[in-house]
Amino acid sequence: AALGAAAVIPACGGAAGDKSLSGLDRERFRSEVNGRPTGLYTLTNAAGMEVCITNFGGRIVSVMVPDRTGTLRDVVLGFDNIADYVRIPSDFGASIGRYANRIGHGRFVLDGDTVRLPVNNYGHCLHGGPDGWQYRVYEAHQPDPRSLALTLHSPDGDAGFPGAVTAKVVYRLTEDNAIDIAYEATADRPTVVNLTNHSYFNLSGDPTHPILDNLLTIAADGYTPVDSTFLTLGRIDSVGGTPFDFRRPKAIGAEIDSDDEQLRNGHGYDHNWVLATAGDLSRPAARLVSPVSGIALEVFTDEPGIQVYVGNFLDGTVRG
């Protein structure tokens, strides 16, 4: 993902003392979860951008990026301490595993055998179940100020999944304000693995300002519709003539209240778009722009689809 604004990016120094540019106190992230140490790790570049990550759940906690005036703004949702991440179940900024999104009815067939998993969302297994990797402590290694490698070992039978898996997530902040996230997983036997990042972006940089005016573009002619339990129906529908057509920039809120069955099923947008950019990293799969701040986010991926979720179940009672 690349973040930027239509402005000259000023050079900025590092955070003073033991606090990040976003105001995070590193001491509030120094703890233990299930006997494993947690911490806050900071990535910086010469352009003044800062990304803070905790190894609890491999989560992006804050992203400071300059707006059109050069003012640094935090554009992701996150808590300011490890205790809230542990106490309040959420996927804020998390590295999701062992399997992102839903496995229908908590079961799948592998090599002729039916594997059964815990269900935690409308009768399905969502994001690896109730004890997904977003609640685990990763081993952290920071070789330089611009990168962080996180490693997790998941034993055979973990949350019902077959095979022992070693997963590695590498975050890298580039000099042109891109956050590069690379995933790698190895298993000792056939299994399923599907990894992603679950950050919530508000490019206005103002948590009181809704995202509905953000302009979204998705390079996709089709999407996969879902039933009322958010499970895909096994087909690809055209976005043409529907609220799911973001082939040209459109405000997220422009049609979100339309009388549309798919919007009702998803309680808003919580769908997978079938990308026209599949396998092509030379052009963005999606682009989001805040008219308030001028900050733009471009997403590049070599995957065939992109899931867009606009926080339909965030009711404002949890603040990050």
Q: What is the role of each PLM region?
A:
Residues 1-3:
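N-terminal export leaders
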Residues 12-51, 55-320:
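An exposed, glycine/acidic-rich loop-and-rim segment of catalytic or binding clefts
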